[in-house]
Amino acid sequence: MKSRQGGFTLLEMLVAIAIFASLSMGAYQVLQGVLTSDEVAKKKEARLSELQLAFTLMERDITQMVPRSGRIDGENNKVLLAASRFGQQSDDWGMAFIRGGWLNPDGMLPRSGLQRVGWRLKDHKLERLSYLYPDPVIGTEPRIQPMLDRVTALRLYFYDKGAWKEEWTQRNVLPYGLAVELDLEDYGTLRRQFLIGAGGQRAENAN
């Protein structure tokens, strides 16, 4: 009598292959889910870092605003804070002013501690404008630094005499505070309020 040979039948092999394929697919889906979640988390972390950097630079600029007007195209415009709709060629609100506190250790660089800066919205990007000197010569183009993308609106508000105002028309005096509102595609409306250290002060070079 012949002894039965050991091993798996074709049906058993097919069943084993099907089970292995099912387990492999499940493991792959779990791995893909983990990788996708990790990628989303990294993108959100990068976005939050961009927001933090933009607001940090904005805070440094605004809080160190000084009551000094600058020359534009060779002429003194006598405006301390130029803030308006479509100002600085913005697609929404834009602003420009002179700030202090621009570090120049031991006077190593051929410039002062004052800097002309501006902020605007262009093509859904929040941009920071800066010049090497507070009174740039005619034809000088600013350095344009993109700070945030996916921005749909930029609004400014000005604090004076205990209230927030939607416009700033005083040429030779600074407001006490400035609020910036950004509409973002992913985070909605964000508002930051900044105290201007030189708020209420008039132009140092008014004459």
Curated annotation (Swiss-Prot):
Keywords: Cell inner membrane, Cell membrane, Membrane, Methylation, Protein transport, Transmembrane, Transmembrane helix, Transport. InterPro entries: N_methyl_site, Pilin-like, T2SS_protein-GspJ, T2SS_protein_J. The modification N-methylphenylalanine is found at residue 8. It comes from the Bacteria. Residues 1-7 form a propeptide. It is found in: Cell inner membrane. Its main location: membrane. Cleaved by prepilin peptidase. It is a single-pass membrane protein. One of its GO terms (cellular component) is type II protein secretion system complex. The chain crosses the membrane at residues 8-29. GO terms for biological process: protein secretion by the type II secretion system. It holds the Pfam family T2SSJ. SUPFAM superfamilies: Pili subunits. Type II secretion is composed of four main components: the outer membrane complex, the inner membrane complex, the cytoplasmic secretion ATPase and the periplasm-spanning pseudopilus. Interacts with core component exeG. Component of the type II secretion system required for the energy-dependent secretion of extracellular factors such as proteases and toxins from the periplasm. Part of the pseudopilus tip complex that is critical for the recognition and binding of secretion substrates. Belongs to the GSP J family. NCBIfam families: gspJ (TIGR01711), IV_pilin_GFxxxE (TIGR02532). This is Type II secretion system protein J. It comes from Aeromonas hydrophila. The lineage of its organism: Bacteria, Pseudomonadati, Pseudomonadota, Gammaproteobacteria, Aeromonadales.
